[in-house]
UniProtKB/Swiss-Prot annotation:
Residue spans, zinc finger RIP-type: 137-212
A molecular function GO annotation: zinc ion binding
Phosphoserine modification, residue list: 18
Record keywords: Metal-binding, Nucleus, Phosphoprotein, Ubl conjugation, Zinc, Zinc-finger
Name listed for the protein in its UniProt record: RPA-interacting protein
Subcellular location: Nucleus
Protein's organism: Rattus norvegicus
Pfam families (alphabetical): RPA_interact_C, RPA_interact_M, RPA_interact_N
Length: 219
């Protein structure tokens, strides 16, 4: 079906900009793509890391370009000279910008994938450290934990009375490793550990992950 002459997509290809207009449009599109990082990565995760080039990827690039075009056409942002332009658009103008947006998208996803690989490497190192050495404090990841009279302590200041009277280093190690492995089964990011609780309640050891918005009480 023929596209309406007044549609945003046709408008995008109808009017032309001089080189200064092209640069303004290019910079605006790149900024929008960078600000759409969260949206892009959500789509990438939902596609389970499929190869770039799908219809949804192309839709995001087009969406970014049309949003920036509409922004430039607004009364506040659009130069008067641009509003008066009626020359046919040189398609190479948009093709160049579209390719640059594709490159930016690939760069964002490449950076994300490298981060996942780094997180996986750190997670494996942390688990190996727990298995090979005295139990490392998951909060400071520097000193060894000590368990005495059912109280877990660390030189970093961690001090947590346990509800279990028979808590041992082996049991705490198994609990930590079990929770970390359970989390890594559905999220590639490294969880963080912290101590919660104030003066009127017993402190607890909490494992949380901002990436998948989950948490668990370890101790």
């Amino acid at each position: 079906m023929a596209e309406s002459s007044g549609s945003p997509h046709r408008l995008l290809y109808k009017q032309v900009g001089s080189p200064p207009w092209k640069e303004t449009f290019r910079q605006g599109c790149l900024e929008r793509m960078r600000n759409s990082r969260h949206k892009l990565l959500n789509r990438y995760r939902q596609a389970a890391g499929s190869t770039l080039g799908t219809a949804s990827d192309r839709l995001l690039v087009q969406e970014v370009m049309e949003e920036e075009w509409n922004s430039l056409q607004s009364v506040e942002n659009c130069p008067e000279a641009l509003l008066q332009l009626e020359l046919p658009l040189n398609l190479a103008v948009l093709q160049d910008i579209e390719q640059e947006l594709w490159n930016e998208e690939k760069s964002i996803i490449s950076e994300y994938e490298k981060g996942l690989q780094f997180d996986e490497s750190c997670l494996n190192s942390m688990l190996a450290e727990w298995e090979a050495n005295p139990l490392i404090c998951p909060v400071c990841i520097k000193y060894n934990l000590r368990i005495m009279n059912s109280v877990v302590t660390c030189p970093c200041g961690l001090h947590i009375p346990s509800h279990s009277t028979d808590l041992t280093e082996q049991k705490l190690r198994a609990c930590l490793e079990g929770n970390v492995n359970e989390h890594s089964a559905h999220c590639p990011h490294i969880p963080e550990f912290s101590v919660t609780g104030g003066t009127e309640e017993k402190p607890s050891l909490l494992m949380s992950c901002l990436a998948c918005d989950t948490w668990a009480v370890i101790l």
